[in-house]
């Protein structure tokens, strides 16, 4: 084998090893998690998912815990920053299946936007400011505005509404329902959670 050939083979092997190492160092998969805490063991939460299976969630160092407390449609005022989980309607409006009211401190941190969601097949999420909120025979009609658009939202009377509030690890206890927006799936199958939203006093996350 010539020196040139040996160098070529060596370069190919090095490139393959480099590519393999790079693939192994890729960022963990980001996942959303909805479920109920079954057990707390040190820093590990055993969570039963709505699909019926369980997984282990480990809050990251300095994980942010945000509580969700029960609220109502009457609590939503013009100018509030809200998240609307909804189903698109034929006329282009959105029919809410859940609403959450952000804390003032979350404005500017949580982006205003409209995007596909996975609460139900075909569902959407709109983080936006409430421009109007009027009573209607079918509930409430809200106009909400986000960074590059606005949506008409129909809110039936039985739509679950929650308000975000400061929380802490004391809220993470058996029976509490949680939502993890951006968990990181680790090679061992556990989920590392940089932030956890947790229902307080039996509240279920509506998003």
Where are these regions (language model features)?
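Short, flexible, surface-exposed loop segments at domain boundaries
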Residues: 2-8, 14, 18-207
């Amino acid at each position: 084998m010539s020196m040139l050939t040996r160098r070529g083979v060596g370069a190919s092997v090095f490139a393959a090893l480099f590519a393999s190492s790079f693939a192994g160092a890729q960022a963990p998969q980001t996942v959303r998690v909805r479920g109920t805490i079954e057990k707390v063991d040190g820093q590990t939460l055993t969570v039963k998912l709505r699909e019926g299976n369980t997984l282990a969630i480990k809050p990251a160092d300095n994980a942010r815990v945000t509580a969700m407390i029960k609220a109502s449609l009457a609590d939503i005022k013009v100018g509030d920053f809200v998240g609307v989980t909804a189903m698109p309607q034929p006329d282009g409006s959105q029919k809410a299946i859940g609403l959450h009211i952000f804390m003032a401190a979350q404005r500017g941190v949580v982006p205003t936007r409209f995007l596909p969601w996975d609460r139900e097949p075909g569902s959407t999420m709109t983080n936006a400011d409430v421009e109007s909120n009027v009573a209607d025979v079918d509930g409430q009609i809200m106009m909400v505005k986000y960074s590059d658009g606005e949506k008409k939202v129909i809110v039936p009377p039985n739509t679950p509404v929650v308000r975000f509030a400061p929380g802490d690890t004391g809220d993470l206890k058996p029976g509490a329902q949680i939502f993890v927006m951006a968990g990181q799936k680790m090679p061992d199958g556990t989920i590392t959670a940089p932030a956890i939203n947790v229902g307080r006093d039996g509240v279920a996350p509506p998003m």
